[in-house]
């Protein structure tokens, strides 16, 4: 029976290392795999530094990012851990969400304290909705002065509090990734302490299947004698036949109706689940009442909006993006889920223009409403070509 088998496997959590360049993010990632390999050899292969450092490139919404994916297990959990070698890769990953993080390990060198990129990563983590942070105070073996260590820890806590993380309460663990990698038992113990903090301070995320049903509509057609069918890939939740649904987005008004049947490859199903490509038969809905870009939802669980704040990354010319900057009142298309909607851009005060390769915040006003929530990802396009990527940080109206 599949269900019992699933409960036997460990809960899965996605995390990543963030922080300033050369503070030891990649060394720490390698050290975690080594220490966990030594502790639970049958569960964990060891991943050396140079394998993580030469991370393969992958594309997310047309943007190339170098990301290293590492897997490991503690006694309690199975982790997928992302580490990006370059600072630009981090920013791109966090904004495009190529690798989603349920929590992050913020690496700060005790020898330096928080640096500009430390601040930038924490700010971005807050903007893109990384919900929990655990701090690894790395290179602690190189600082003999206890007072200095306490001072650095205080600085990190204040930085996190300034971005609305619980800076006073979250775990800060003093580690030495290099010493742990060299096999020093005391520092290996500190790394196990860090992983225990990750196990206990980064809560289990809610699985997509447990959230309310949402399916973006990709296509609409009419089946003679049966009515209108909408197809798409269910993004989250579960839907059963004869449940009420709501159609949201693109039009001024949302429509409520009943889903009278669910099919896949012309077979009827008893439910549609997150991740499945399905057709939903809708009662009493005309073909012209629905279109691509709307979403089918559990009634009341998503609302249409036209105005929002966002954090975005604009592709460089080398990445196939624009060759020139854009200015106030720029009017590209914003691609949400399955459709493009034109929007007008207002840049933040003090920003006159945005260059290719920049990341920035902006306010956008769409010409049609989209079912929207905080953190929703989108691409910015011009004539079907991706020129940027972003996510909603705040809904205005």
Swiss-Prot record:
User: Can you tell which superkingdom this protein's organism belongs to?
Assistant: Bacteria
Example GO molecular function term?
A: GTP binding
Enzyme Commission number, as recorded:
3.6.5.3
Q: Could you tell me which residues belong to the region G5? A: 176-178
Please verify whether the record's keywords include Signal: no
| Places the protein is found | Cytoplasm
Q: Where is this region: G2?
A: 62-66
**Membrane-crossing segments per the record:** none
Per the record, the major location class is cytoplasm
Which stretches of sequence are listed as region G3?
Answer: 83-86
Q: Which UniProt keywords apply?
A: Cytoplasm, Elongation factor, GTP-binding, Hydrolase, Magnesium, Metal-binding, Nucleotide-binding, Protein biosynthesis
Q: Name one GO cellular component term.
A: cytosol
Query: Which stretches make up the tr-type G domain?
Result: 10-206
Per UniProt, where does GTP bind? 19-26, 83-87, 138-141
Family designation: Belongs to the TRAFAC class translation factor GTPase superfamily. Classic translation factor GTPase family. EF-Tu/EF-1A subfamily.
**Role:** GTP hydrolase that promotes the GTP-dependent binding of aminoacyl-tRNA to the A-site of ribosomes during protein biosynthesis.
Q: What is this protein called?
A: Elongation factor Tu
Provide the gene name from the record. Answer: tuf
């Amino acid at each position: 029976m599949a269900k019992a088998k699933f409960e036997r496997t460990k809960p899965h959590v996605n995390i990543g290392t963030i922080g300033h360049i050369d503070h030891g993010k990649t060394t720490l990632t390698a050290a975690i795999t080594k220490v966990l390999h030594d502790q639970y050899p049958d569960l964990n292969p060891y991943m050396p530094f140079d394998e993580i450092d030469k991370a393969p490139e992958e594309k997310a919404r047309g943007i190339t990012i170098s990301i290293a994916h590492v897997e490991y297990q503690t006694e309690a959990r199975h982790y997928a851990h992302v580490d990006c070698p370059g600072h630009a890769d981090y920013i791109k990953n966090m904004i495009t969400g190529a690798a989603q993080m349920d929590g992050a390990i913020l690496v700060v060198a005790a020898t330096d304290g928080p640096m500009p990129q430390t601040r930038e990563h924490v700010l971005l983590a807050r903007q893109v909705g990384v919900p929990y942070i655990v701090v690894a105070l790395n290179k602690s073996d190189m600082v003999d002065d206890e007072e200095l260590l306490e001072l650095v820890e205080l600085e990190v806590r204040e930085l996190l509090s300034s971005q609305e993380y619980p800076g006073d309460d979250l775990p800060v663990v003093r580690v030495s990734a290099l010493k742990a990698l060299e096999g020093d038992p005391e520092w290996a113990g500190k790394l196990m302490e860090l992983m225990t903090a990750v196990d206990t301070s980064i809560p289990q995320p809610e699985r997509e299947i447990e959230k309310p049903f949402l399916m973006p509509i990709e296509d609409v057609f009419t089946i003679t004698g049966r009515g209108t069918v909408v197809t798409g890939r269910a993004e989250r939740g579960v839907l059963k036949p004869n449940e009420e649904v709501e159609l949201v987005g693109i039009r001024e008004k949302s429509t409520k109706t009943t889903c009278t049947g669910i099919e896949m490859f012309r077979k009827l199903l008893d439910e549609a689940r997150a991740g499945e490509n399905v057709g939903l038969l809708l009662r009493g809905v005309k073909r012209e009442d629905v279109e691509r870009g709307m979403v089918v939802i559990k009634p009341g669980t998503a609302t249409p909006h036209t105005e929002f704040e966002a954090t975005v990354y604009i592709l460089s010319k080398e990445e196939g993006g624009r060759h020139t900057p854009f200015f106030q009142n720029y009017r590209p298309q914003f691609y949400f889920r399955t459709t493009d909607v034109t929007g007008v851009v207002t840049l933040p005060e003090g920003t006159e223009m945005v260059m290719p390769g920049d990341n920035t915040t902006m306010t956008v006003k769409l010409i049609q409403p989209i079912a929207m929530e905080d953190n929703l990802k989108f691409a910015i396009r011009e004539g079907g070509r991706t020129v940027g990527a972003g996510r909603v940080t705040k809904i205005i109206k």
